[in-house]
Amino acid sequence: MGGKVLDSSIPNLGEDTLSSLIFKNATVRGAKTAIREKDLGIWQSWSWADVAEEVGLLAGGLAAKGFIRGNNLAIIGDNRPRLYWSFAASQSLGGIPVPLYQDAIADEMIYVFNDAEIEFAIVEDQEQVDKLLEIMPQCEKLRCI
């Protein structure tokens, strides 16, 4: 953590988006703490620069896989910092984050994936990967987990 804050391939979508505010705060607040999480009893902290770097890397990975403006991104995971970074990464590319309950059974997700025409999904763990692999043949657009 702690490299370059902005990637020139990320479009500027305006001052009022979550991703734009993260990048602006990274420039203004840099090393100051942006978010903290207690994991296994130990507090973890990320600076604004760290968060912007994570969001930029996620956005770069999504873009490399073909994620473009207007795409919907399913996000399935615990209520943790990386989940929110996925929201911002999607929005930084002009995409739409679609959060889904991680405890939903696979069959319950099929409708959402098809109705929202979701092509991409970011998931927290192997359990969620397995769930999506199980329903992938029934999800008309899903192509990247």
Task: Specify the residue positions occupied by each region the protein language model found.
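N-lobe entry segment of adenylate-forming
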Residues: 1-46, 50-65, 69, 87, ...
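Residue-level recognition of alpha-helix initiation/capping sites
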Residues: 16-17, 53, 81, 104, ...
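Amphipathic alpha-helical recognition patches that constitute DNA-binding helices
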Residues: 17, 72, 108
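Conserved AMP-binding/adenylate-forming
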Residues: 42-44, 59-104
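DNA-binding alpha-helical recognition surfaces that contact promoter or target DNA
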Residues: 53, 75, 111
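Aromatic/hydrophobic pocket-lining residues that form the small-molecule binding cavity
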Residues: 55, 83, 109
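Structural core segment of the AMP-binding/adenylate-forming
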Residues: 64, 92-145
